[in-house]
């Protein structure tokens, strides 16, 4: 009898324990109290999808030329739709190319001056560093030949086109920009802005109309880079450019490629001889000149052989042209309002 009662009591206790466990594990209150943990976990699982990938690192150098500070590594990103990115530049096909040693970004605030012919303050080039610059283009035959020579050596330059020439040959100037070169301005008509015959207003017109013509030819804003024709710096014009936050370019070394007795060989010796004396510098040439187009391939090879390195100069921002001069250039009728079309796409020979 006692054994039966003990067995019955044990069964009752076991049933009570099982019922208690079931209640606390599966009751509605218990289920609700555990739900927030599940929601938080789901939110945490979504975070990596919006986080930056560890591959998202800066690709441009700082204004001073020093590399940008490394950013802290971000957690790996989850699956996401990639944003559109600019295609990477094509690799250089010439293993012995001169190339570009470094790219510097110029803050043009206040109109800084470059080139020791006129400006001594900003000595940013190291020994054996040179900047290639070309004036007076664009011009058929010569400018494309200059572009090819630069492309063959995978190197870059700064171009200062004349506004009128830009309006005559916008398709060539577009090629300059498309090749990755920097495009500034060299006035509208190559007027001497330091002449006593030119007024301050006329000098302003030359400057602004030149920039507007370059903008209209390119279809985009030019760099706030300017070079005076004949390197004739009128004081009032210098002040005006400073107020417009336009960098003013002189040079360190003139190739004198515009002289009547110039030849490709003479031009090369002038440049290389000047670099031997100076050790570095901003070189002034003209893509308008045939001899420069002919000399450039060998000159670039000589620069490479001599251990010289190319520095590319780019502006921190672009120049906002003035509407009145944009209208003035547009009314001249020389610059196409829409994008330029190749002649072959407009006029074709159908019989001969």
List each model region and its residues:
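Active-site beta->alpha N-cap acidic-glycine motif
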Residues: 91-200, 206-215, 220-223
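Short low-complexity, flexible loop/linker segments enriched in glycine and/or proline
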Residues: 173-176, 198-201, 264-266, 325-329
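Catalytic grooves of carbohydrate-active enzymes
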Residues: 271, 276-314
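N-terminal pre-catalytic segment of deacetylase/amide-hydrolase enzymes
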Residues: 2-132, 139-145, 152, 266, ...
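Alpha-helical scaffold elements lining the catalytic groove of polysaccharide deacetylases
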Residues: 142, 191-218, 232-279
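A short acidic, amphipathic alpha-helical/loop segment
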Residues: 145-146, 171-172, 237-240, 295-299
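Active-site-proximal beta-strand/loop segments in catalytic clefts of secreted hydrolases
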Residues: 134-137, 160-164, 187-188, 227-231, ...
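Residue-level detector of anion-binding/catalytic polar loops
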Residues: 156, 182, 247, 254, ...
